[in-house]
């Protein structure tokens, strides 16, 4: 029995889906699922794609690895305006998202599809560049794990600038 969705909306980077419970007599409360907003998930997908296109141009393996770790993990960022570091990343930007959220799963599938693709423009560019070992190394990264385990990585401020460079538009 699928849940009957009553309301779905996006607000402040989140997607809220309100539905009736499976069985009416189980509970009087509606179910509220909290996910990353589809617009935000699409932004992550665009960044994943741009990271791979940049790799196809530069062949900088370490930068590609760091970009995927950056997207799927959590990190510290120094904010010069308040002279403090703040936590950011897939968990710290979306702490209210449930670990089994649909868009987190979709981001993992998207990354997997790009890494393992056999057809398409990006696949043609990546095929001669990515070895099986490299693919395995990339597929260790996961949005779900980064969120649920609060996986933390450390980058210098200059490395973060390099990582973000291909996403500027």
Regions found by a protein language model. Name each.
Residues 1:
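Active-site palm subdomain of RNA-directed nucleic acid polymerases
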């Amino acid at each position: 029995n699928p849940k009957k969705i009553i309301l779905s909306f996006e607000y402040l980077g989140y997607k809220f889906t309100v539905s009736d419970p499976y069985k009416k007599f189980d509970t009087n409360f509606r179910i509220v699922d909290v996910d990353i907003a589809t617009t935000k998930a699409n932004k992550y997908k665009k960044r994943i794609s741009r990271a791979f296109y940049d790799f196809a141009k530069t062949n900088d393996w370490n930068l590609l690895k760091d970009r995927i770790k950056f997207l799927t993990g959590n990190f510290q960022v120094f904010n010069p305006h308040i002279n403090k570091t703040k936590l950011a990343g897939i968990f710290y930007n979306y702490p209210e998202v449930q670990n089994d959220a649909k868009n987190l799963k979709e981001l993992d599938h998207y990354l997997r599809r790009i890494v393992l693709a056999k057809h398409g423009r990006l696949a043609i560019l990546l095929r001669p560049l990515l070895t099986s070992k490299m693919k395995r190394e990339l597929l260790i990264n996961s949005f779900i794990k980064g969120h649920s385990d609060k996986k933390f990585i450390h980058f210098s401020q200059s490395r973060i600038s390099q990582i973000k460079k291909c996403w500027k538009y």
